[in-house]
C-alpha cells in the first residue's frame, strides 16, 4: 500500500514531465521557467540547447529583499515577471516559451506571465 503523500508528489512529477516534454528552449527562444515553493517564487530563463540558465530572479535575491519583495503574493509575482523581462531584453531575448511546471496557469503563475508580457516578452 502506497502512502497518499507519495502518490501526490509522484503525480506532481508526472505533471511537470508532461508539460516539459513538449517544451524546448533555444538561444533565440529560451524557456521561461516558474517555480513556486511554500515561501518563495523563482523565475528563470533557460537555454535547453546548451543546458544553461541565462538569467534568474527570485524573492530570495538581495535586491528584492532590500526593496521588500519577500512575500509570496500576486503583486510580487507580477514584479518578478517584469524584472525577468527587463533582464531578457538586455540579453536580446524577445520571445520565450512559458514553462509553468506542475502548477496550474492561475494565480501567482498567471501574474508572473502577465508581468513578463507587460515587460515586453512574447509567448
Swiss-Prot record:
Q: Which NCBIfam families match?
A: L18_bact
One of its GO biological process terms is: translation
Looking up Gene3D superfamilies in the UniProt record yields: 3.30.420.100
Please tell me the species this chain comes from: Chlamydia caviae (strain ATCC VR-813 / DSM 19441 / 03DC25 / GPIC) (Chlamydophila caviae)
Does the entry feature the keyword Ribosomal protein, yes or no? yes
The UniProt entry's sequence similarity note says: Belongs to the universal ribosomal protein uL18 family.
Which Pfam families does the UniProt entry name for this protein? Answer: Ribosomal_L18p
What is known about what this protein does? This is one of the proteins that bind and probably mediate the attachment of the 5S RNA into the large ribosomal subunit, where it forms part of the central protuberance.
Q: What is this protein called?
A: Large ribosomal subunit protein uL18
Q: Which GO terms describe its cellular component?
A: cytosolic large ribosomal subunit
GO MF annotation list = 5S rRNA binding; structural constituent of ribosome
HAMAP family according to UniProt: Ribosomal_uL18_B (MF_01337_B)
Q: Does the keyword Plastid apply?
A: no
Q: How does it assemble?
A: Part of the 50S ribosomal subunit; part of the 5S rRNA/L5/L18/L25 subcomplex. Contacts the 5S and 23S rRNAs.
Amino acid at each position: 500500500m502506497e502512502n497518499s503523500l507519495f502518490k501526490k508528489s509522484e503525480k506532481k512529477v508526472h505533471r511537470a514531465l508532461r508539460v516539459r516534454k513538449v517544451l524546448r528552449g533555444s538561444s533565440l527562444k529560451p524557456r521561461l521557467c516558474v517555480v513556486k515553493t511554500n515561501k518563495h517564487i523563482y523565475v528563470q530563463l533557460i537555454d535547453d540547447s546548451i543546458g544553461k540558465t541565462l538569467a534568474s530572479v527570485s524573492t530570495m535575491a538581495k535586491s528584492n529583499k532590500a526593496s521588500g519583495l519577500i512575500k509570496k503574493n500576486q503583486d510580487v509575482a507580477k514584479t518578478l515577471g517584469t524584472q525577468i523581462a527587463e533582464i531578457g531584453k538586455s540579453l536580446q531575448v524577445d520571445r520565450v516559451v512559458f514553462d509553468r511546471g506542475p502548477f496550474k496557469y492561475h494565480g501567482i503563475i498567471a501574474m508572473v506571465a502577465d508581468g513578463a508580457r507587460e515587460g515586453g516578452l512574447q509567448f
